[in-house]
UniProtKB/Swiss-Prot annotation:
Its main location: cytoplasm. The gene is hisI. Binds 1 Mg(2+) ion per subunit. Pathway: Amino-acid biosynthesis; L-histidine biosynthesis; L-histidine from 5-phospho-alpha-D-ribose 1-diphosphate: step 3/9. Its cofactor is Mg(2+); Zn(2+). It is found in: Cytoplasm. It comes from Citrifermentans bemidjiense (strain ATCC BAA-1014 / DSM 16622 / JCM 12645 / Bem). Transmembrane segments: none annotated. This is Phosphoribosyl-AMP cyclohydrolase. GO terms for molecular function: magnesium ion binding; phosphoribosyl-AMP cyclohydrolase activity; zinc ion binding. PANTHER family: HISTIDINE BIOSYNTHESIS BIFUNCTIONAL PROTEIN, HISTIDINE BIOSYNTHESIS BIFUNCTIONAL PROTEIN HIS7.
Length: 125
C-alpha cells in the first residue's frame, strides 16, 4: 500500500489544484496529513497556510469552493494533484481564474491579469 510521504518537507506536501474539465492549473498550495484527510473526507479542498499558520478551506471567505473530483499522487508519493470542479468564477484570491497569470516574456515577468471579482469587496479583513 502506498503511503503519502509528509516527512520530506517537514510535514507538508505540495498540492497542485487542476480544473477537472479544462486541465488548467488553478493553484498550488500546501497540505499536511490533517488537511489531506479533511479534503478526502469532505470532498472540498483544505490546505495549511504557511503564512497564516492555520488550516483553511478553499472558498470559506469568497464562496469560490472546490469540489474534489479525483486525487492523484506522484511516483514518490510526496505531491498530490487534485482535480476539482471550481465553484464560482475564480480560484485565486486576486480575483483571477488561476493563480498563474504572470508570464515570463522577453526577459521580464508580465502580468496578464483579468480579475473576475474585486478582492476588496470579497475579503473583509
Amino acid at each position: 500500500m502506498i503511503k503519502i510521504d509528509f516527512e520530506k518537507m517537514g510535514g507538508l506536501i505540495p498540492a497542485v489544484i487542476q480544473d477537472n474539465e479544462s486541465g488548467e492549473v488553478l493553484m498550488v498550495a500546501f497540505m499536511d496529513e490533517k488537511t489531506l484527510n479533511l479534503t478526502l473526507e469532505s470532498g472540498k479542498t483544505w490546505f495549511f497556510s504557511r503564512t497564516r499558520n492555520k488550516y483553511w478551506m478553499k472558498g470559506e471567505e469568497s464562496g469560490n469552493t472546490q469540489d474534489v473530483v479525483e486525487v492523484l499522487t506522484d511516483c514518490d508519493a510526496d505531491t498530490v494533484v487534485i482535480k476539482v470542479k471550481q465553484n464560482g468564477p475564480a480560484a485565486c484570491h486576486t480575483g483571477n481564474r488561476s493563480c498563474f497569470y504572470v508570464r515570463y516574456e522577453n526577459g521580464a515577468w508580465v502580468e496578464h491579469s483579468n480579475p473576475l471579482f474585486d478582492p476588496n469587496t470579497v475579503y473583509k479583513k
